[in-house]
Swiss-Prot record:
Coiled coil: none annotated. The keyword Ribonucleoprotein applies. The gene is rpsO. One of its GO terms (cellular component) is cytosolic small ribosomal subunit. One of the primary rRNA binding proteins, it binds directly to 16S rRNA where it helps nucleate assembly of the platform of the 30S subunit by binding and bridging several RNA helices of the 16S rRNA. HAMAP family: Ribosomal_uS15_B. Part of the 30S ribosomal subunit. Forms a bridge to the 50S subunit in the 70S ribosome, contacting the 23S rRNA. InterPro entries: Ribosomal_uS15, Ribosomal_uS15_bac-type, uS15_NS1_RNA-bd_sf. It comes from Wigglesworthia glossinidia brevipalpis. This is Small ribosomal subunit protein uS15. Belongs to the universal ribosomal protein uS15 family. GO terms for biological process: translation. SMART domains: Ribosomal_S15. NCBIfam families: S15_bact (TIGR00952).
Length: 89
């Protein structure tokens, strides 16, 4: 396993542990948020990378769909997760 992948897995597990996340949909949202943040850093250096931009938009769309599902199923967990991940103002 590459060093970069080990580092990403470690940061993901630490995030799950510190935020006390146990449900699958919340884990998926957290993982997508981590990937979106790393892609945002990538775009600061590579503004014209349109292929990666499409991947970013797909990840944002996927996260939005899972968030909508979570909001429908359990509003309290939805609002807690939004607060923990600082997704809304």
């Amino acid at each position: 396993m590459s060093q970069n992948l080990k580092k990403k897995n470690k940061s993901y597990k630490e995030t799950l542990h510190t935020l006390n996340i146990k449900e699958d949909s919340e884990k998926q949202i957290t993982l997508l948020t981590e990937k979106i943040k790393s892609l945002q850093k990538h775009f600061l250096e590579n503004k014209n990378d349109l292929h990666s931009r499409r991947g970013l938009l797909k990840k944002v769309s996927r996260r939005r769909k899972i968030l909508n599902y979570l909001k429908r199923k359990n509003k309290m967990r939805y609002f807690d997760l939004i607060k923990k991940l600082n997704l809304r103002n």
